[in-house]
Amino acid sequence: MNLYPWLQHSYKQIIYPHYINKGHHSIILESHKNIGITCLAKHISLWLLCQKKNKSIYHCKTCHSCQLMNSKNHPDWHYFGSNTCLSKNSSKTIGVNEVRNFTNTIFNSAQQGQNKIVYIPNIKKLTEFAINSLLKIIEEPPQNTYFLLINYLPHKIITTLRSRCIIHNLYGPTKENRIEWLKEQNINTNQKIHMSMLYSNEISFISKCKHSLFFLYQERLNFFETLLTSFQEKNFLKMLNVLNNKKCLDQIFIWICGIILDSIKWKHDINTIIINTDQTKIIQILASNFSILSLDNSYKSWIYCYNNIKNIPGINIELLFVKQLLYWEEILNIFN
């Protein structure tokens, strides 16, 4: 997979110190999800393991090491958790025993005679004891061993780990990046509705492109039509069916929070930066009928609802949505 253009600058910033032999052995990549951070981690790994890396800041693609990486069989690239049946999407934590098990492996010499990489795709899965055990290794690492860790915001890294690593904060693509990349993928960006979808949240850009744009287009239209009807009939519970759509749950929160933010912009007469340009009717209803305070509290309540869904295992999502819709109606009535 090619490196995404909006991550090229970050890639060069990370690789160049290593190219001149002044790089740090422990790197943390920190960002929100779905901007291509795992792709960046792979390209960093490819270069660190490349047998011809002294010739360029990019891996050569042809040496034996590069071929092993592309076939996912490199013996010196250690995916943290692969030996414990943990996948990247697993909800299980990684404990101190797993750290001790892989420690024995990395203290051996590199099988390809180059570097070794320990790749941890999500710091959040490490228990406190696992982190403490990992810290001991990072403080005195084996020769030619690099640690590449990913931290997804808003999760906060403990101070002791932060102080022992170089942290690179990564950001999503700009509008220009997105349009250019979509053109390269032969995706039509002329339709205003698609542009609204793509601009609504930069951190989920790649995630949206992985889905069918047509599917999201239909779901988004259905969502806003139901939202408009709910306001017109003054019955928020009508939204329950569209909210309870697990196929695009994250997008639903993006849409509803986005429309609330647009209505706040409208009240402040800054209409030029509105995202949902095709939904001005709903924006005007919110802006003309509700106060800034009620809209602000509405936005916060939906963020709180989203965090509960993401962070409370086994929560009854439908019941939570019923509670949230009734609470939202109460907010709009009380603070208006």
Swiss-Prot record:
The signal peptide, as residue positions, is: none
Known catalytic reactions: DNA(n) + a 2'-deoxyribonucleoside 5'-triphosphate = DNA(n+1) + diphosphate
Q: Which Gene3D superfamilies match?
A: 1.20.272.10, P-loop containing nucleotide triphosphate hydrolases
List the record's Gene Ontology CC terms alphabetically: DNA polymerase III complex
Q: What class of enzyme is it?
A: transferase
One BP term from GO: DNA-templated DNA replication
Which SUPFAM superfamilies does the record associate with it? P-loop containing nucleoside triphosphate hydrolases, post-AAA+ oligomerization domain-like
EC number in record: 2.7.7.7
Swiss-Prot/TrEMBL keywords? DNA replication, DNA-directed DNA polymerase, Nucleotidyltransferase, Transferase
User: Pfam families per the record?
Assistant: DNA_pol3_delta2, DNApol3-delta_C
Q: Name one GO molecular function term.
A: DNA binding
> Whom does it interact with, and what assembly results?
DNA polymerase III contains a core (composed of alpha, epsilon and theta chains) that associates with a tau subunit. This core dimerizes to form the POLIII' complex. PolIII' associates with the gamma complex (composed of gamma, delta, delta', psi and chi chains) and with the beta chain to form the complete DNA polymerase III complex.
Q: Tell me, in a sentence or two, what this protein's role is.
A: DNA polymerase III is a complex, multichain enzyme responsible for most of the replicative synthesis in bacteria. This DNA polymerase also exhibits 3' to 5' exonuclease activity.
Q: What is this protein called?
A: DNA polymerase III subunit delta'
Organism encoding this protein: Buchnera aphidicola subsp. Baizongia pistaciae (strain Bp)
The gene that this protein is the product of is holB
